[in-house]
């Protein structure tokens, strides 16, 4: 279930109505009046939720799901366990996106500009001109917030934090002694779209951002909220200016990311990992504890703990050096040698 501090529950819907909305076919029409209250990922789904699987790699999770219903391709329908109603569609993720938009809505700041009467500020909080703080937000003692920054509804911001000017924070739980510099955007929707019957549609991003104690985030950097699970930045990690961290990323403790690093969705990064400037990481890979990624490198697969990888595509540094040396020798050879 999406966090109610950040997402409004729009009320239940029956499976029959959901089938019409999504363009899916309900296999068991006797289940048309079954009530759905939320969307969920396949694993650990609540009993009154609907989920989806568009990749056969998730069918083992479908077989074990506790969801009330699941959007599946017809070829995968048999994977649904007893008690899980199947809605057949050629575009399960698009159907899920439509269901998510019907059942959940992001909370937004309403009312007059300024600090909501429903926000909670501890003693010693300092606000610059033009700061907006939404309903239900909590700001810890000694935190300073710069001019024209926006703290969205429900956000929790710890003690002794420094938030510079023109920062936007939403859908986030932030620890103590966190430093976020000018222009950073925390908790915006992750980049998620899928192809439906009428073209590309946005997938509602229903997760949060968790930033632990002592983290620094540079100017104009972005940390997107999760698609459903959270985006997490571990304790004491230091992030430079203009860094992009996508949805569902999990960054460990004491990591360093130099400027222009880009981390794609659902990447897992261990503790003490270092990234040179303009390094990039493709989605769904794991980078082990203490690994290092060289500047302008492109990581396309898992990096083992403690190793240094460089190049495009990135590979172990010793291999890269041998390849570079061989290429230099070949380039220096005269014709006929």
Q: Model-predicted segments: where are they?
A:
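Terminal amphipathic alpha-helical/low-complexity segments used for targeting or macromolecular assembly
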Residues: 1-114, 177, 183-184, 189-202, ...
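Structural signal for interior beta-strand "rungs" in well-ordered beta-sheet cores
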Residues: 52, 114-316
